[in-house]
Amino acid sequence: MAKKDAYKLTYNTSDTLFATNLGDILAPSFASIKQTRNLLGFSSGVDSTALFFLLLECEIPFDIAIVHYHTRLQADDEVAYAKELAATYNKLCFVAHAPHFNANFESNARSFRFDFFQSLIIKHHYTHLLLAHQLNDRLEWLLMQLTKGAGLGNLLGFADERYNYDKSLNNYTIVRPLESIPKNELYRFCKERGIKYFEDSSNQDKTFRRNYFRYEFCDKLVNEFSAGIARSLSYLQRDRQSLENMLYADTLELESLKMQILRQIHNISVPMHTHKICCIIFSIHKSKVQDDENLLLLFCDKVAKQCGYVLSAAQRDEISKSRFNCKIAHFIITSNTHRIYIAQDSMSMYKIVTQSPMSKKFKIFCASHRVPSKLRFLLWAEFCAWEMLCKSAYADADYLVNEQGNQHLFTHFLAKIDNFFTL
């Protein structure tokens, strides 16, 4: 008898009833991924293992990916179990081995993990990333952000849409089917079926802030009030989505500058990391939000998160005090009379140096079109990079080396950015 059949025979009447109840709860989430290419972020813990078997029950297509951090002896067994499950149920299993992180382990591990998932999504054309975050996880995040001082934009974590800033790459959707399911229900699900899973011993260490919140507050609250907490988080999510839908950004992509950066970074694997290089200026018209400072701050939150960064309470205060005219981390935040602009300072991040100083004509153009001074060096760098690419592509064309050709080149570039700063 195949192992898959043996798994199905572990059901009894109460198991089947419980599976039906949990399946009913998850049906809306699963309906959207029946015909898609799905990658499951797997850890061999109770959450992702329960999701693995729930996906099997509902005949959802998926493969799995796991990261080996080499921080615990048990991790070898966890990776081996992932491979065993994949082989048993005819799934692909991808494994990444993380380097040693000297500091900020959680942040660096998360970044490495998502880079790994991203590379697989690009290479194998997955459209959805399935994550096993459950209700307790969501409450942990909310309470930790609440104690730091956070607005609606950051209380609920990252959005479910991941945008790649490389046009050649596809965007993908993150699905969290278990987000309204209490963790104790997942323990029950696995226990009643005799499903093996692993417990990460580091989760017991209360010196980690997340673990402290988990054991002192979150688990107790979810065990007592899970239904109400799930509803509240759902309402907050809808409220945030409605607000963020109002905050649609106009964008100006600095494509030539990005190409120059990519040429300079020879030691970075293109499919794994270029999605992080954001050479885009984001903008919103103040009248769109009635010049409401809170909504403009929410816009800043939204753009920062699209770039993989969470603004702190202190940073939000600094943006407000500066009247949206400051630099936060690698973000340039500036404005003119009509608009707010946000861009990553890619020149500083990647040590880009322009070969020629700003021309007088370019300075006049910027002044007449109300281009904020903090953005002018980015636009000039884009022009210099674009000019270099054009001259390289048309090296034999005479018009590019005479005054008339250069004038045509410059006029074409200005036309590209004209409407962005005047409308």
UniProtKB/Swiss-Prot annotation:
The keyword Transport does not apply. Its EC number is 6.3.4.19. It catalyses: cytidine(34) in tRNA(Ile2) + L-lysine + ATP = lysidine(34) in tRNA(Ile2) + AMP + diphosphate + H(+). GO terms for biological process: tRNA modification. It is found in: Cytoplasm. GO terms for molecular function: ATP binding; tRNA(Ile)-lysidine synthase activity. Pfam families: ATP_bind_3. The keyword Cytoplasm applies. ATP binds at residues 43-48. Keywords: ATP-binding, Cytoplasm, Ligase, Nucleotide-binding, tRNA processing. One of its GO terms (cellular component) is cytoplasm. NCBIfam families: lysidine_TilS_N. The N-terminal region contains the highly conserved SGGXDS motif, predicted to be a P-loop motif involved in ATP binding. Belongs to the tRNA(Ile)-lysidine synthase family. Ligates lysine onto the cytidine present at position 34 of the AUA codon-specific tRNA(Ile) that contains the anticodon CAU, in an ATP-dependent manner. Cytidine is converted to lysidine, thus changing the amino acid specificity of the tRNA from methionine to isoleucine. This is tRNA(Ile)-lysidine synthase. It comes from Helicobacter hepaticus (strain ATCC 51449 / 3B1).
